[in-house]
Amino acid sequence: MSTIKLSQKVRVSDPCYDNDVWCKTNLSNVYPGEYNVEVDKTDLGDWGNRISRLTVIHKGYVVECADESSWTPHSDIGVDSGQAGIFCESSYRNDELAAGITTPPLDRPFVIPFRNEGDVWYDKMCNFTLAGESWGAYDTGVVTSSGIGDGSYPLDVVYNDTDEIVGIRITYLDDTEDEDEGDCCGVCGGEIEDDGECAYCCD
C-alpha cells in the first residue's frame, strides 16, 4: 500500500488549477502524519476500468475511518483536466520539488509549454494519470484520473475527537447509483425488464 505524508494544510484539487480558481478545496485542520492511500476502480464495460474513488486515511485512524457513518460531506471538487488529487499544500504546483518526482515512462509523453509557474509539477501529475494505472503518488501527494472525465465530485472527510481531519475521500463514481439504475439496453439505453428484454426495442 502506498503512503503519503500530509501537514496541517492540504490542497484537494485538479492539479491544473492555480490559486485563483474557486473550485478547489483548501483544508487547514488536517492531522499531520503518514496517510495510507487507497484507490478503488470500477469496471464500466466499454469504458474500461475507471477510478471510482480516492481515499487517504491517517495510519492512526484506520479503524475509525472504516466506519462509513464517520464520513462527513465537506465540499465539491471541480475537475477540468480529467484528474484530481490530495496534496500537502507545500508541494502543490511546486516546480522545485517536482524535479525529484519520478513518474512512469510513457510511449507518448505528455508535453505542455511550461509557460506558468507550477507547470513542471503539473506535467509530472499528468504523466502519473496517463500511465497504465491512471494514478500515482509521491512523498507528499497523490493524483488520480477522475472516473469518466471532467465535472464536480464530492469530497468527504473524517474528523477525530479534536476536530482534526484524519480521512479524506473523493468519489468519482458511486456504485450504489449504478445498482439502483438496473441493467440498460445496449441499443437504446432503455431499462431491461425482468424477462431480459428491452420494452422499447422488443415491441
Language-model-derived ranges and their functions:
Residues 186-188:
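Extracellular/surface recognition and adhesion modules
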Residues 192:
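Cys/His-rich microdomains that often coordinate metals
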Residues 195-203:
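Cysteine-rich micro-motifs
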Residues 1-180:
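Intrinsically disordered, low-complexity acidic regions enriched in Pro/Ser/Thr
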